[in-house]
């Protein structure tokens, strides 16, 4: 089973709009990630689940427009920011092995769900979620989960994220990290 955990894209602050729709940057970031996921990562999903919050719904819809989930997009319970991750852990345990699911949600829930699946401990932060990122988990032998790869909006225009997949040559991963560090350093210089 493949599970794609997506933190909703950047949203407006509550004082700007109480519904907290995606910000202009949020729309740009998630479109970029979705397009990249379709064209370069070749993600295929059976269904996309999202919380009932507008920012998660908008993020899920952009992803669906690019990934074309066979069973569509559905709002689901238990995906709010403070939801108990064990509900989804149990649900995923009962899901068929050959299915590919995407969950669009919020922190701290997504981080806790990843910790629960990977270690059995919700308080273990194992992936550095950011707005608009996708973390791919795979359930393998003996029901054990592992992180396959992760992509953030900041990495998309600057590197080939497929090199971050497990088993990629270490030189490729090193090159990507060096490029990302150089870009981050330049951004810091630009703000000074």
Locate the predicted segments by residue.
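Active-site-proximal alpha-helix that buttresses catalytic centers in soluble enzyme cores
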Residues: 2-86, 90, 110, 122, ...
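Residue-level signal for well-ordered alpha-helical positions
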Residues: 62, 116-117, 140
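C-terminal/domain-terminus segments
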Residues: 156-166
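Generic beta-sheet signal
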Residues: 3, 97-105
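Domain-level recognition of soluble alpha/beta enzyme cores
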Residues: 121-148, 152-156
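Short, flexible helix/strand-to-coil boundary loops that buttress conserved ligand/catalytic motifs
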Residues: 114-117, 151
């Amino acid at each position: 089973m493949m599970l794609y955990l997506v933190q909703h894209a950047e949203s407006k602050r509550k004082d700007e709009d109480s519904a907290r729709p995606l910000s202009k940057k949020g729309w740009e970031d998630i479109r970029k990630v979705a397009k990249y996921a379709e064209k370069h990562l070749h993600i295929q999903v059976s269904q996309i689940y999202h919380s009932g919050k507008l920012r998660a719904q908008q993020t899920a819809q952009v992803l669906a427009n690019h990934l074309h989930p066979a069973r569509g997009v559905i709002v689901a319970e238990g995906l709010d920011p403070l939801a108990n991750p064990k509900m989804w852990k149990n649900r995923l345990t009962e899901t068929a092995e050959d299915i590919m699911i995407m969950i669009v949600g919020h922190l701290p829930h997504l981080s806790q769900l990843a910790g629960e699946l990977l270690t059995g401990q919700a308080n273990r932060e194992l992936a550095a979620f950011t707005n608009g990122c996708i973390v791919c988990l795979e359930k393998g032998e003996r029901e054990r989960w592992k992180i396959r790869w992760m992509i953030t909006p900041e990495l998309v225009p600057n590197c080939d994220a497929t090199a971050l997949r497990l088993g990629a040559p270490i030189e490729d991963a090193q090159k990507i990290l060096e490029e990302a560090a150089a870009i981050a350093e330049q951004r810091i210089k630009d703000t000074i």
